[in-house]
């Protein structure tokens, strides 16, 4: 099985919260696609609570689109990582990491402004697979933590696992 890009970086050295360009590619028509690793938690040390990450999933995508879309950028998708330490954001365009970090912080400010669970988009049995598994309080705790800790940039070069280590891990 081919090695996924996300498994070629050393998770023991990742900082969080931090932005990292996880992958860049071009469509057959030449459009640039960038995938960002938006790391909310330090891998293997922290994890977002399931209700909080689920609520954040509903809020974060819209807020990020409000702040980032335009000027050659359009978000395709923002999805939580299975390990619950962050989100992947796929988009058309090539915004730099600092722009993404600034927008991420603005989106966290927006999360803190949500006053009631009823303001969470698509929070119903028809549009959400587990519509009762939400917590606005947990989502706001996550947002507050991001803003208090600030958002850094993780460098692929600094995090790259050496080929010897990948071989040692039998990958």
From Swiss-Prot:
Catalyzed chemical reaction(s): S-(5-deoxy-D-ribos-5-yl)-L-homocysteine = (S)-4,5-dihydroxypentane-2,3-dione + L-homocysteine
A GO MF term: iron ion binding
Source organism superkingdom: Bacteria
Keywords per UniProt: Autoinducer synthesis, Iron, Lyase, Metal-binding, Quorum sensing
Binding, Fe cation: 54, 58, 128
EC number(s) on file: 4.4.1.21
Enzyme class: lyase
A Pfam family recorded for this sequence: LuxS
Comment on bound cofactor: Binds 1 Fe cation per subunit.
Required cofactor(s): Fe cation
A GO BP annotation: quorum sensing
Gene3D superfamilies with a match to the protein in the record: S-ribosylhomocysteinase (LuxS)
Family that this chain belongs to: Belongs to the LuxS family.
HAMAP family: LuxS (MF_00091)
Physiological role: Involved in the synthesis of autoinducer 2 (AI-2) which is secreted by bacteria and is used to communicate both the cell density and the metabolic potential of the environment. The regulation of gene expression in response to changes in cell density is called quorum sensing. Catalyzes the transformation of S-ribosylhomocysteine (RHC) to homocysteine (HC) and 4,5-dihydroxy-2,3-pentadione (DPD).
Subunit field text: Homodimer.
Protein name stated in the entry: S-ribosylhomocysteine lyase
Organism (species): Escherichia coli O157:H7
UniProt gene name: luxS
């Amino acid at each position: 099985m081919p090695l996924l890009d996300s498994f070629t970086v050393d998770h023991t050295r990742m900082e969080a919260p931090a932005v990292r360009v996880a992958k860049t590619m071009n469509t057959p028509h030449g459009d640039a696609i960038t995938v960002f690793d938006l790391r909310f938690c330090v891998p293997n040390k922290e994890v977002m609570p399931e209700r909080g990450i689920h609520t954040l999933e509903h809020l974060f995508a819209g807020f990020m689109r409000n702040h980032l879309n335009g000027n050659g950028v359009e978000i395709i998708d923002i999805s939580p990582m299975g390990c619950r330490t962050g989100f992947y954001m796929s988009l058309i365009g090539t915004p730099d990491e600092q722009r993404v970090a600034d927008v991420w912080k603005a989106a966290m400010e927006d999360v803190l402004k949500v006053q009631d669970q009823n303001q969470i988009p698509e929070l119903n049995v028809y549009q959400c697979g587990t519509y009762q598994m939400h917590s606005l309080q947990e989502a706001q705790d996550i947002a507050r933590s991001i803003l208090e800790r600030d958002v850094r940039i993780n460098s692929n070069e600094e995090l790259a696992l050496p080929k010897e280590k990948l071989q040692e891990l039998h990958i």
